[in-house]
């Protein structure tokens, strides 16, 4: 029986930046405390939302170390350690394990356009290099490669590959993964928490939780309790805002939203830039309806 890393809601936490572009660790500490106080069940550091692709090696390690220290075992810390370079992904994974992370989130290799056999070889090599439990992250809209159900089945044979973060948007594929593997499944899309959890998913790895940790936790909790009616009502209440968090490339809108809320997380690093005024106005409007504007 594979160990479940968490049930409920995990936040794919943003990395706050100072005006000149350095990481704002004081603000980062505040965001971590806010998440734990809001009921978040796990924290994913150095993921897509955390701008890991724009970090140096040292920053990546320091963010993981800092998060592990501040969380202090109150909830699991899941470290993003994926790369399109297998050797580098192994290095990141070993470093995350040494720094005290509780689990790893490994995105599929991007840009290389490897085959399904290549995905098996890539993830197997990483799994063999560490003892931490691993969540595979499937987000073909960003990486250009999709993990097939057959590949999931093959990778599930590895003892420490325990879960999938599914952001493909393909509910039929999620159903097959649930039916044909023993992997825990987490929704990687905030607008699909209820359908994925109704198929046996264990929770969500969420962008929305950066702004609404309690509500995101409640949606997942209702699902875990079997109250899909309440879960759906809350998910639909937040749907316009949820959609507007992806009105531009993640994490541009969620950082804008947090700044509108007065959290002062700064802007994204280049090559990501602040979105256009019309998009900001649309985001502000959906936030205003929920009472989230300062």
Give short role names for the model-derived ranges.
Residues 2-11, 15-144, 152-154, 293:
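Active-site beta->alpha loop and helix N-cap motifs at the rims of alpha/beta catalytic domains
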Residues 102-106, 183-189, 203-207:
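Short hydrophobic/aromatic-enriched beta-strand-loop microsegments
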Residues 104-105, 136, 159-169, 183-186:
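Catalytic beta/alpha-barrel core
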